[in-house]
């Protein structure tokens, strides 16, 4: 395997857990809330949520396992915060795939217009 393909393969392997974690609507909503509201306690994250506090805790743990979020103690509360590095890696992966598709579509257009 060429070094370029090997690097691409490593990037995909690293981002699969991120995309899997973001593939759930509840977790995606939690990411949006944390990205717009900053660090939040579980109590605050469950306000106006259609799921229980226990469910939110489980979803946050999935995000943490994927490297997307982490918690810290603030007194008696756990405060959750996003880790933007993994989101950036996922975005770069999508940008790379988009560039590949743009290139393929450009080549197809040239071929068809001959």
Predicted regions and their residues:
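N-terminal helix-turn-helix DNA-binding core of bacterial DNA-binding proteins
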Residues: 2, 10-52, 66-67, 74-92
């Amino acid at each position: 395997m060429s070094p370029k393909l090997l690097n691409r393969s490593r990037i995909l392997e690293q981002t699969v857990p991120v995309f899997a974690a973001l593939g759930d609507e509840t977790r995606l909503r939690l990411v949006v809330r944390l990205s717009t509201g900053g660090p939040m306690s579980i109590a605050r994250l469950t306000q106006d949520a259609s799921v229980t506090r226990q469910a939110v805790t489980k979803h946050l743990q999935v995000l943490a396992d994927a490297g997307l979020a982490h918690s810290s103690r603030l007194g008696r509360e756990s405060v959750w915060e996003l880790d933007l590095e993994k989101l950036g890696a996922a975005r770069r992966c999508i940008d790379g795939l988009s560039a590949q598709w743009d290139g393929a579509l450009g080549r197809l257009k040239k071929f068809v217009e001959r």
